[in-house]
Design a protein with these regions (language model features):
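Extracytosolic ligand-binding ectodomains
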Residues: 1-156
């Protein structure tokens, strides 16, 4: 992207969620201004409307992460692990009521419990899992973001 700008490209630049980190902003600098990208809501959690279904969970992650690692250190990548932990914390107790951990029956019960998770808000969206959908996210799992003044801004 930086090279495109240096060569005089004036068109709109779109990126993927893979650039949603502080290093991208640092390396690209002013050449990133105006870039649009879809990202998980956690990237702009503090800018989400109060009634956004992900705001509370995303802010919980951001606050805990930054309390441990420092202000401005949060990235979307760690939030994926956080979300997986919340998913497991929701499903494991259900599976443990049906079988002993470590057994074949427990693995099947855990799979069934994971596939049964509904309306679980996490940092990146709201999980609604099923036997045919192991991602479990819908449109609430992404927002449009624009680089403005070297920071991420929610596009409203």
């Amino acid at each position: 992207q930086k090279s495109l700008k240096e060569k005089g490209y004036k068109g709109q630049i779109y990126q993927t969620h893979g650039v949603a980190n502080a290093d991208f902003l640092r390396v690209c600098g002013k050449d990133c201004e105006g870039t649009l990208l879809p990202a998980g809501p956690v990237l702009v959690a503090d800018q989400l409307p109060a009634d956004h279904p992900v705001k509370k969970s995303a802010m919980e992650y951001v606050n805990k992460y930054e309390a441990a690692q420092g202000k401005g250190t949060v990235s979307t990548f760690g939030a994926h692990a956080w979300d997986a932990g919340l998913l497991l914390a929701t499903a494991a107790p259900v599976a443990m009521k049906k079988a002993q951990p470590g057994s074949k029956e427990f693995r099947a019960a855990l799979r069934d419990a994971l596939e049964g998770v509904r309306n679980l808000p996490v940092a990146h969206g709201v999980f609604n899992m099923s036997p045919t959908d192991h991602l479990g996210f819908d449109q609430r799992a992404r927002v449009m973001v624009k680089v403005e003044n070297g920071t991420w801004k929610l596009v409203k």
